């Protein structure tokens, strides 16, 4: 069975944000605006997305 993935796009700048939010974006493999990253749908990734929800857009499940 294929692992579900999430497609995440960075829509906000990490400038003037807390260092932990910048590090979370790096952990999500995002470092510039409008970059898209495909990540496995795990509880840890969902938690990271929730932490920077104001800076990213989730495009949905990619099976």
From Swiss-Prot:
Q: Name one GO cellular component term.
A: cytosolic large ribosomal subunit
The Gene Ontology terms for molecular function here are: structural constituent of ribosome
Write down the CDD domains for this protein, in alphabetical order: Ribosomal_L30 (cd01658)
Keyword list (alphabetical) reads: Ribonucleoprotein, Ribosomal protein
Identify its protein family.
Belongs to the universal ribosomal protein uL30 family.
Which NCBIfam families does UniProt cross-reference here? Answer: rpmD_bact
Q: What is this protein called?
A: Large ribosomal subunit protein uL30
Name of encoding gene: rpmD
């Amino acid at each position: 069975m294929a692992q579900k993935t999430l497609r995440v796009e960075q829509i906000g700048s990490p400038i003037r944000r807390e260092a932990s939010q910048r590090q979370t974006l790096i952990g999500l493999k995002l470092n510039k605006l409008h970059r898209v990253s495909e990540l496995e749908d795990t509880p840890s990734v969902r938690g990271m997305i929730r932490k920077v929800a104001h800076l990213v857009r989730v495009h949905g499940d990619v099976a």
